[in-house]
């Protein structure tokens, strides 16, 4: 449906089950027809990641250009790009200013891949994303490929995007490459909220330790960017204190630039 058709597509699939491959198939179809593809990534950090990851398109003679608020826009490069990578907010801004020569490139997009389309349901950013997609459809009527790991209302999204049933896919947990096991752990709660954060972090590290020792990875969610930086620093110290080897993955840098993390 993605490579051989032109219909809009909505796909929901578990994390790491191949959504990036679906995006790349849509891009390949667009490039095959000499079109311009736009990939809308939810965060600036992911736009940088895609730029590095899609070097292989450059090797095939196609140009990839990232447009974000933290970079100086080169309108000529944007106009000549085969693949554009942008955040929802920057795409929103470009579509609002499409009449200006600086942002006229946005009206030449033939295919839009929306990553993490479930953000439509979020406060603030959801409204921006919805308005941006609607504006794009009015400006240049591109093919829309909407991807998400969690989309409970996939039929509603498909209906809004005019994606037919044969181009609407919902893959269950059986497609997850790694089994997901759920568990609830408790920790002792004290009177000091600051100390409680570290109690929770140590409990999380206790769970993660055996996986890290086997050269695995762990992802710890905290409530804010500031807490993320503190937890990362404390985790590094605690892991060193526990003598857990981590050198196999190379250097460990903290990406603490607010623009990079937003």
Regions found by a protein language model. Name each.
Residues 39, 48-51, 55, 59-65, ...:
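Conserved C-terminal RecA-like helicase domain
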Residues 71-85, 262:
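Conserved motor-coupling elements within RecA-like helicase/translocase cores
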Residues 134, 142-239:
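Conserved interdomain linker/interface between the two RecA-like ATPase lobes of SF2 helicase motors
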Residues 12, 26-50, 138-141:
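Conserved SF1/SF2 helicase motif Ia
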Residues 20-21, 35-56, 90-92, 149-154, ...:
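Conserved Walker A/P-loop ATP-binding site and its immediately adjacent core
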Residues 1-12:
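Conserved pre-motif I regulatory segment
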Residues 19-28, 125-132:
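Motif I (Walker A/P-loop) of helicase-class P-loop NTPases
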Residues 84, 88-92, 99-144:
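SF2 helicase catalytic motif II
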